[in-house]
């Protein structure tokens, strides 16, 4: 079994050069990042009852799955985490390593997928941000992630709900009308409803900890955490 969807990997590999361009094809992720980082930071601090806030993730191991060019990996490292970041696209990892040279951060970037990660290590934190809608076998993917997470570890998943509204906003609006994303970036058939994701996770010893929506404020040009989960949502799970 495998989690890699080669069509998806080829699609993102073609855009790899633009990962760190805030006005390029990954502009939405750059806009998205502050909300994602704050959500993860707050979730980790609350779960592990952390009281040191300068580098709150110190002594915590973190696995960023589907890391792309490292847009989340680098901020996680700055928070003090011992970061391993993986991506099935060789081109993405090359871009991430190249950008890493501009910083003084230490991140272990590996061109692989969770089921092929040759690592006996188990992680305190796992990030699956905007990745589950691009894998070939979601159940197997979640199983592999659970196997890599320590007991009482926390995993974050951000993805798209499978609703009519998500089709209108995330595909028709974002790809065809506003051109925020290249046409074909998303396949609505691969979107997953929160209750379906929760059920899959529960089958692999992952208990939902928190679930929220993320919405775009057109007037402020920023993304915010919200109760509205009809399009984008983010969840955290604790391993039993």
Where are these regions (language model features)?
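Conserved SAM-binding loop
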Residues: 51-55, 60-165, 194-195, 235-239
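Short, flexible, mixed-charge acidic loops at enzyme active sites
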Residues: 166-176
């Amino acid at each position: 079994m495998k989690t890699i969807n080669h069509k998806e990997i080829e699609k993102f590999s073609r855009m790899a050069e633009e990962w760190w361009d805030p006005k390029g094809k990954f502009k939405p992720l750059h806009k998205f990042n502050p909300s994602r980082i704050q959500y993860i930071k707050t979730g980790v601090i609350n779960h592990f009852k952390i009281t040191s806030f300068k580098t709150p993730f110190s002594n915590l191991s973190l696995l960023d799955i589907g890391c792309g060019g490292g847009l989340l990996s680098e901020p996680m490292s700055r928070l003090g985490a011992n970061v391993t970041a993986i991506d099935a696209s060789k081109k993405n990892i090359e871009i991430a390593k190249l950008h890493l040279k501009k910083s003084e951060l230490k991140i272990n970037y590996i061109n692989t997928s969770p089921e092929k990660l040759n690592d006996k290590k188990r992680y305190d934190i796992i990030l699956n941000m905007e990745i589950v809608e691009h894998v070939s076998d979601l159940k197997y993917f979640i199983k592999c992630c659970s196997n890599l997470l320590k007991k009482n570890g926390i995993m974050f998943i951000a993805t798209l709900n499978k609703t009519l509204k998500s089709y209108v906003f995330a595909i028709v609006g974002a790809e065809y009308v506003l051109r925020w994303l290249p046409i074909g970036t998303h396949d609505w058939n691969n979107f997953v409803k929160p209750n379906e994701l929760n059920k899959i996770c529960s089958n692999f010893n992952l208990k939902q900890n928190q679930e929220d929506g993320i919405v775009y404020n057109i007037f402020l040009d920023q993304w915010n955490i919200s109760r509205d989960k009809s399009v984008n949502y983010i969840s955290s799970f604790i391993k039993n």
